[in-house]
Amino acid sequence: MSSRYTPSEMAQALGAGLLSFPVTHFDADMAFDEPAYRSNLDWLSSHPAAGLFAAGGTGELFSLTLDEVDRAVRAAVTQTAGRMPVIAPAGYGTAIAVAMAQAAERNDADGILLFPPYLTECDADGVAEHVERVCKATSLGVIVYGRANARLDDVALARVAERCPNLVGYKDGIGDVERMTRIYARLGDRLLYVGGLPTAETFALPYLEMGVTTYSSAIFNFLPEWALSFYAAVRARDHATIYRELNDFVLPYTVLRNRRAGYAVSIVKAGMRAVGRPAGPVRTPLADLTEDEFAQLTQLIGGRR
């Protein structure tokens, strides 16, 4: 089996709806709980997301072994059974990222989300070379994740896009409005644009005006119907609904999220526990919410489950 999508078809499919970034399940001994992960993917994929990103940031890529990444991707491909594109991660240094991209292709993923290089300083030209090498190592469509040290400006991104037809997307986790505006102004419909800031619902409406038609919804993990409804309001530019839900739920949620570094992932697993779908603890160096914070989150979720 191989990808059912060409790179451009994959990008088009992802841009048409909300994106699912599932957590990775761990047991009490911090081992990857693949049966629980597969069961949760069955549940998640029963909701109409446009694509599923296995072992991404919300899935604690940074805490997984490469073997666990492969297992998570293979499980996602199997459990979704063609209902949506499955996007696999690639990251760290260029050699490892190339190996991960090639493994994703062997595991029948439909595309690659390319994470920033690991623990090194680099300029836009260096990042561009990194992205180009990964793109040329696979036939899958690649979405580059602009975040941390992976800061491509519009000129560098356009150069890579010209050289690599399978570079089909840019995910913005930087939040620089001028940079995003320049990228969209230069590249337009050449790329898919994905909102990737933590709790992306916060920024979904203004980002839509910059050509960003979709985003990674961590909240989808525990409130999929709410997340899909909010996304529909964004695409309809229903300001009244958007700002009601921002004030009543999203912004108070971000207050809890901001209590501690790394809570952007931890709070998602806490949310799953709150709705009766526990996924186990987060792996170190992250920390789980305190019981008091968990109680506050449970109260905030309320009847939205």
Curated annotation (Swiss-Prot):
Gene Ontology molecular-function annotations: 4-hydroxy-tetrahydrodipicolinate synthase activity; 5-dehydro-4-deoxyglucarate dehydratase activity
Catalytic activity: 5-dehydro-4-deoxy-D-glucarate + H(+) = 2,5-dioxopentanoate + CO2 + H2O
EC number(s) per entry: 4.2.1.41
Record-linked Pfam families: DHDPS
Pathway of action: Carbohydrate acid metabolism; D-glucarate degradation; 2,5-dioxopentanoate from D-glucarate: step 2/2
Gene3D superfamilies membership: Aldolase class I (3.20.20.70)
Top EC class for this record: lyase
InterPro entries per record: Aldolase_TIM, DapA-like, Dehydro-deoxyglucarate_dehyd
Disulfide bonds: none
GO terms, biological process: D-glucarate catabolic process
Keyword Transmembrane helix appears in the UniProt entry: no
The entry's keywords: Lyase
Family, as annotated: Belongs to the DapA family.
Protein name: Probable 5-dehydro-4-deoxyglucarate dehydratase
